[in-house]
């Protein structure tokens, strides 16, 4: 860690969980650089214009931050959600979802890791989701991006542990943020009679659950504890008791028993 204030780079810091993390860590004494496409800042932390979808933007952003000193920690929180049935989503829409949520994270990691190694170590938090552990109907490509992130984070943790870099996957359930309002709908959704009723019900359920979810500050508090822990966990879930119970049930129940419970919870009908 740096001899002065610990320095953290947070992606997706303009809103939602990323912004909450920036505010929380700044209040706790961290030197925060919050990256987003707009470079938004607030209350004393530094804003950085950086688009995780763009190789050169990420390279320039990380290089610029490193010019002022080492990066002690990374919180990779940039992401968004695509709604629609699998067959409704175009390949370009699906690729765009993975581009930000998965490949954007990879871009930042590949720029930050060499500097962390040279500095003797660091902490990395990858913002996953309960949707990276349980497939969410009508958000299949969002779930795919988070399932991919789970695999990446687990493998990465093994690779960099001998180098003094600790990796934690933080897995929030429903969180009350502007993620709900910014969810994108697949263009082919309009006029589709096959999935219309089920999609409308599923999105409505998502929105209600998110509106009643935990505040983003709860996730930020977990992120801070992970970054400041002497022995950070490999995974940390955040959410209401029912969501955490669902994750436990997936690990412990036979598949068919879990599937029946999940269908009921997700409002999925069967024939």
Predicted regions and their residues:
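A short, exposed helix-loop element centered on a Lys and neighboring polar residues
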Residues: 109-110, 154
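Substrate-binding pocket helix/loop in short-chain dehydrogenase/reductase
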Residues: 85-86, 93-95
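C-terminal beta-strand-loop-alpha-helix "lid" module of Rossmann-like NAD(P)-dependent dehydrogenases
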Residues: 161-210
